[in-house]
A protein has these predicted regions:
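Glycine/proline-enriched, intrinsically flexible loops and inter-domain linkers
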Residues: 1-87, 92-547
């Protein structure tokens, strides 16, 4: 007999599940070693049912992992069917096509058993501080250049660690203590989720999670289908160009078809994959596409498998959003972060009040690799790290774009104090970019300007994640484009898709793009303009542009 739940019990169980993954996420942050997890929150924790279908995701998670993480658990099940799993096993991979689209993201999952029967998985993805290979940049031509590849395998068997894998990983990364420290922090999070899930099942006498999963998935699927059904049927198209590589832009095309209570997204006509590391694996394409649909149709709906069942994503094999092995993809967000904008371009034709102008993303980042000078009590040693810098969001019908906010990712920036402590870099300044937000009835969010100086006694290799230096974030409904991004080394403009070496005293200037404006700037509220002037968001000689 199928177990049923009254509304109150269902809500209690659902909220308990969300609470336990949030608790695991907090534990991961508190036990992690790298700033990418501890400060930037570049990770996710989920619980799935026994088939790998996501039930709940931690509240403060990376949006793309909503789509990639449960898919990876399903891939684990293909490699390790239930009869090949045991209590205490921990599965691991960073495979580009089975994971998140680039090697630095390490995914782990732990089967949860009850009375000898597989009932669920706890799982986590986290961005490792280093995964070996060439310093992360758009330059690698094949995945083999990008670092240490971990096929789907067991990190732990019945509670025992695969020391061979650990030794290989330690030998192949620049920051073994941080990389392995974060990996074990992920395992701690898995253990905590397992403990809390089994306690919840005991408290409510649940023999398994299938009935609960069916309720959660069914309700979210119904809600998403209802939201889609409220939209007019039809095929809507959009396309855009990215800065691309080697002075050649990349064109991405989308056709979004609404048919009753389903949405079909097709990337036919998109440019082919390239021999640079901006290729966006299908797993990431799927995740960014469904996320764009969700924020336009049902943004408050909890994230789980049911919410995405009515959405289908297709792309031709070999195009840049469905690259084939051995394509490189370490900088896949330089393509993937544009995909929600394409969804907005399609849905904005029928629900213009729900979309924003173009945003100043893909997010910017600065990768560094070198030798950190000896510090008090510590010898000099290799280091590798990454700092994120965000541009401005696009304006909407409701108001101005948010300033320096990461979207469609939601990573945080590492504080200057911590950044300077862990690296031989000095931040000369970090400030908002006046006049960078696109003019409009509602102004685009501002970008920021960061000046960094190398204080290292030895050379530092640096590379960047940077877009919208050629094509700025456009405005909509009469709004103006935001300011394009700027990247300079020692005052000279440089190609953001290349790797460089900094000597002591060299400086890097990163000026992130502003978001696009919304509506005619000539009807901007006078009080809003005066507030912008007082805050320094616009300058006196730019008032005409922002009036």
């Amino acid at each position: 007999m199928t177990q049923t739940f009254d509304p109150i019990t269902l809500e209690l169980l659902w909220r308990r599940l969300i609470s336990l993954v949030d608790e695991a996420a907090a534990a991961l942050v508190r036990t992690s070693f790298s700033t990418l997890v501890r400060e930037s929150y570049d990770f996710s924790c989920i619980v799935t049912d026994d088939a790998g279908q996501s039930l709940v995701q931690a509240t403060e998670s990376i949006p793309s992992f909503i789509g990639t993480l449960p898919a990876t658990v399903k891939h684990f099940l293909r490699f390790f069917p239930p009869d090949q799993l045991a209590p205490g096993d921990v599965l691991v991979t960073n495979d580009i096509w089975l994971g998140t689209g680039h090697l630095p993201d390490i995914t782990v999952a732990k089967p949860i058993f009850r009375n000898g029967r597989l009932v669920a998985f706890s799982a986590s993805t986290a961005h490792a501080p280093d995964i070996g290979g060439k310093i992360r940049s758009p330059e690698p031509r094949e995945v083999f250049e990008e670092g240490f590849q971990i096929p789907p395998m067991k990190l732990m068997r019945a509670g025992g660690t695969d020391e061979t894998l650990v030794t290989l990983l330690r030998k192949n990364v620049r920051t073994p203590d941080q990389t392995l420290g974060d990996l074990w922090a992920q395992v701690v999070a898995l253990d905590l989720m397992e403990e809390r899930v089994t306690a919840l099942m005991d408290a409510y006498a649940l023999p398994d999670l299938r009935a609960l999963a069916a309720e959660i998935h069914g309700r979210c699927e119904t809600a998403m289908r209802a939201a889609i059904s409220a939209l007019p049927d039809g095929t809507y198209r959009s396309e855009l160009q990215t800065d691309g590589v080697l002075d050649k832009p990349v064109t991405i095309r989308m056709a979004l078809t609404i048919d009753g209570d389903t949405i079909d997204i097709d990337y036919a006509g998109t440019d082919p994959q390239v021999d640079r590391a901006i290729n966006c694996a299908m797993c990431y394409t799927y995740a960014m596409s469904v996320y764009g649909v969700k924020v336009c149709t049902s943004p408050t709906l909890p994230n789980n498998e049911g919410a995405f069942r009515p959405i289908r994503i297709r792309a031709p094999e070999g195009c840049i959003v469905h690259p084939q092995f051995p394509a490189s993809g370490g900088s896949r967000m330089l393509i993937g972060h544009y995909l929600p904008m394409l969804v907005f371009g399609c849905l904005g034709q029928i629900v213009p009040d729900r979309v924003m102008a173009a945003y100043g993303s893909p997010m910017w980042g600065m990768n560094q690799s070198g030798v950190r000078d000896a510090m008090a009590g510590e010898p000099s040693k290799p280091y590798a790290n990454m700092f994120f810098f965000n541009g401005g969001m696009g304006a909407t019908l409701r108001g101005d774009g948010q300033t320096c906010l990461s979207w469609p990712s939601n990573v945080s920036s590492t504080s200057i104090e911590i950044s300077e402590h862990i690296s031989p870099l000095r931040f000369r300044h970090k400030r908002l970019r006046p006049d960078s937000g696109g003019a409009g009835k509602h102004r685009g969010g501002l970008g920021q300007e960061i000046m960094i100086e190398s204080r290292s006694a030895t050379p530092i290799a640096v590379s960047f994640l940077a877009e919208r230096t050629i094509f700025p974030a456009f405005g909509i409904h009469g709004g103006s484009a935001g300011a394009p991004g700027v990247l300079r080394i020692n005052g000279e403009a440089v190609d953001p898709k290349r790797q460089y070496v900094l000597q002591r005293g060299d400086t890097v200037l990163l000026a992130t793009p502003g978001g696009g404006g919304h509506g005619d700037s000539t009807v901007r509220d006078a009080s809003s303009l005066q507030a912008d002037l007082r805050a320094g968001y616009v300058s006196g000689n730019e008032t005409g542009r922002h009036a």
